[in-house]
């Protein structure tokens, strides 16, 4: 199985480190990166690096809000917003985030989010594999008809 790659974009270094430690304690086999805490630097990073499967994204960054980052970088990651502000929740779900964590983040709540990600990922893989088998069966049947 491939190692899950997760990234954190947070402009407050202590908060980024704490979230990193919390994720690693819950999923020590994951590769967790702390990315630059600005929109500009993070957009540049996304343009030249493979996107992580899961992105923990603070809404308020030093140079704007993270919705700008999403518009510019277009990450193909599943997104979890982390913020001290609850007024962005509706907008966060409008951009297909899988969760919205209010700071301070509690370990139990983070675990629920990680389990939601794992559940969604497993469902995607099951659906993809099912569709692949259907395509293979269809292709095989078509070849047999010739």
Identify the residue ranges that each predicted region occupies.
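Non-catalytic signal-transmission and effector/linker regions of two-component phosphorelay proteins
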Residues: 1-5
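Conserved acidic carboxylate
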Residues: 10
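Charged phosphotransfer/docking patches of two-component systems
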Residues: 13-17
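CheY-like receiver
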Residues: 44-45, 52-131
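Alpha-helical interaction/dimerization surfaces of two-component signaling modules
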Residues: 22-26
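Acidic, metal-coordinating helix/loop segments flanking the phosphotransfer/catalytic sites
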Residues: 20, 35-54
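Single conserved hydrophobic/aromatic residue that forms the stacking wall/gate
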Residues: 138-146
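A generic structural motif
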Residues: 27-33, 77
């Amino acid at each position: 199985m491939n190692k899950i790659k997760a990234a954190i974009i947070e402009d407050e270094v202590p908060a980024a480190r704490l979230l990193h430690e919390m994720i690693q304690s819950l999923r020590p086999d994951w590769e967790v990166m702390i990315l630059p805490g600005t929109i500009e630097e993070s957009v540049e990073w996304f343009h030249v690096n493979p996107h992580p499967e899961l992105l923990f994204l603070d809404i308020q960054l030093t140079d704007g809000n993270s919705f700008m980052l999403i518009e510019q970088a277009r990450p193909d990651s599943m997104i979890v917003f982390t913020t001290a502000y609850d007024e962005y929740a509706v907008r966060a779900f409008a951009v297909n985030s899988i969760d919205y964590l209010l700071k301070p983040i509690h370990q139990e709540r983070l675990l629920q989010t990680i389990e939601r990600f794992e559940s969604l990922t497993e469902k995607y893989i099951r659906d993809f594999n099912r569709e692949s088998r259907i395509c293979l069966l269809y292709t095989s049947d078509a070849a047999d008809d010739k």
